[in-house]
Amino acid sequence: MDERRTVKVSKYLSKHLRHQPERIGLTLDENGWVAVEELLRAAARHGFAFSRAELDHVVAANDKRRFTVENGCAADGVHGDRIRANQGHTVAVDLDLPPAEPPAHLYHGTVARVMDAIRTEGLRPMARHHVHLSPDRETATRVGARRGRPLVLTVDAGAMHRAGHVFRVSANGVWLADAVPPRFLLLRG
């Protein structure tokens, strides 16, 4: 599978497993899962056919591990394999992730033009359900670079956790929080 096709299928999956499942007639369960066969049929009906082999390649090759496939599932009316996006949903789903103790520091990639709002309001999920935090500066830099020249913010996750804030970690290692109040951002200057 060539790189262009891989990216195209990955973007299609993100759009329909995170943001707009209804556009192709999918109904995600409460935890964001849908039967693989249902997804493949819906995509084909809406003019974007791809094979199970292509789907498996995208799931395995995605450097950000955006998707999870569970094989042989027999839960919630799904019999067979099911798939979901690991995080980043704008549709209502409960990823059913247990609370987790974060490392002392986590990182958030952003850009300068939103720093005034961040200093005042902290980090908010915006259209998503959670604020996404990276376990290392390198990942946060790549995230911030998608919107321009990146700035990396350090989050005092240990202090946040001790203050009662709940963290969860998705299947691909992205840390999730409901919000990050400004007092837990370690800002210079």
Swiss-Prot record:
GO terms for molecular function: NAD+ poly-ADP-ribosyltransferase activity; tRNA 2'-phosphotransferase activity. Its EC number is 2.7.1.-. GO terms for biological process: tRNA splicing, via endonucleolytic cleavage and ligation. The keyword Signal does not apply. Keywords: NAD, Transferase. Pfam families: PTS_2-RNA. The keyword Transferase applies. PANTHER family: PUTATIVE PHOSPHOTRANSFERASE, TRNA 2'-PHOSPHOTRANSFERASE 1. Removes the 2'-phosphate from RNA via an intermediate in which the phosphate is ADP-ribosylated by NAD followed by a presumed transesterification to release the RNA and generate ADP-ribose 1''-2''-cyclic phosphate (APPR>P). May function as an ADP-ribosylase. HAMAP family: KptA (MF_00299). Belongs to the KptA/TPT1 family. This is Probable RNA 2'-phosphotransferase. It comes from Streptomyces griseus subsp. griseus (strain JCM 4626 / CBS 651.72 / NBRC 13350 / KCC S-0626 / ISP 5235). The lineage of its organism: Bacteria, Bacillati, Actinomycetota, Actinomycetes, Kitasatosporales.
